[in-house]
């Protein structure tokens, strides 16, 4: 949960900006919500494997709002620089920095 960590208006604005399929921009999204990389990674890595698997990333917008869309395959693969189907903390840091 992000209660007390993030501003609801920031979350709403960030989700609205990526509502259309293919419009999710990692760097812009995390800048809009104002959440640092390691905190985001820990929240998205639901199984605490130290990797964000594609299925976790695909549904991560729903962590912010239950009605949010799933990311497309292209959007989830954007951060997987070595193509292994999962994103490590270093890949994640690169992804959100741009």
From Swiss-Prot:
Pfam families hit by this protein: EF-hand_7 (PF13499)
Residues that, per the record, bind Ca(2+) 2: 80, 82, 84, 86, 91
Modified residues (N-acetylserine): 1
GO cellular component, one term: cytoplasm
Record keyword Transmembrane present: no
Domain EF-hand span(s) in chain numbering: 32-67, 67-98
Keyword Protein transport: no
Keywords for the protein's UniProt record, in alphabetical order: Acetylation, Allergen, Calcium, Metal-binding, Muscle protein, Repeat
Residues that bind Ca(2+) 1: 45, 47, 49, 51, 53, 56
GO MF annotation list: calcium ion binding
Misc note: Is regarded as an important allergen.
Recorded family membership: Belongs to the parvalbumin family.
Protein's job: In muscle, parvalbumin is thought to be involved in relaxation after contraction. It binds two calcium ions.
The protein's name: Parvalbumin beta 1
Lineage of the organism: Eukaryota, Metazoa, Chordata, Craniata, Vertebrata
């Amino acid at each position: 949960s992000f209660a007390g960590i993030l501003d609801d208006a920031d979350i709403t604005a960030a989700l609205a900006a990526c509502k259309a399929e293919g419009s999710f921009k990692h760097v812009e999204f995390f800048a809009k919500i104002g959440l640092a990389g390691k905190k985001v990674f820990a929240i998205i890595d639901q199984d605490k494997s130290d990797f964000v698997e594609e299925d976790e990333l695909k549904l991560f917008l729903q962590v912010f709002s239950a009605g949010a869309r799933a990311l497309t395959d292209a959007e989830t693969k954007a951060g997987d620089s070595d193509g292994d189907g999962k994103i490590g903390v270093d890949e994640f840091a690169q992804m959100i920095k741009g």
